[in-house]
């Protein structure tokens, strides 16, 4: 019984995490699948669109490292670039 409850909680947590981390929460998982299909059609285009830094208001993983993750002129404060 305990194992079943733990499995249900784990599945719910992973589902919520996937929906929260999606770019557009209105589309949820549908948006993730459409991106994968587009990248398969033109893999070179997906490489060119990637950036090495985070834009303004994007998540940055470690505010104590300063502006290492944020684009030029932005600082990492409270886990987002500003």
UniProtKB/Swiss-Prot annotation:
It comes from Conus textile (Cloth-of-gold cone). Keywords: Calcium channel impairing toxin, Cleavage on pair of basic residues, Disulfide bond, Ion channel impairing toxin, Knottin, Neurotoxin, Presynaptic neurotoxin, Secreted, Signal, Toxin, Voltage-gated calcium channel impairing toxin. Residues 23-49 form a propeptide. GO terms for cellular component: extracellular region; host cell presynaptic membrane. Pfam families: Conotoxin. This is Omega-conotoxin-like TxMKLT1-031. The keyword Disulfide bond applies. One of its GO terms (molecular function) is toxin activity. Omega-conotoxins act at presynaptic membranes, they bind and block voltage-gated calcium channels (Cav). The keyword Nucleus does not apply.
């Amino acid at each position: 019984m305990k194992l079943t409850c733990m499995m249900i909680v784990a599945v719910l947590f992973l589902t919520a995490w996937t929906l929260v981390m999606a770019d557009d929460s209105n589309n949820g998982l549908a948006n993730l699948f459409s991106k994968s299909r587009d990248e398969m059609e033109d893999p070179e285009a997906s490489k060119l669109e990637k950036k090495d830094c985070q834009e303004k208001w994007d998540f940055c993983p470690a505010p104590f490292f300063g502006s290492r993750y944020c684009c030029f002129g932005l600082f990492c404060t409270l886990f987002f670039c500003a």
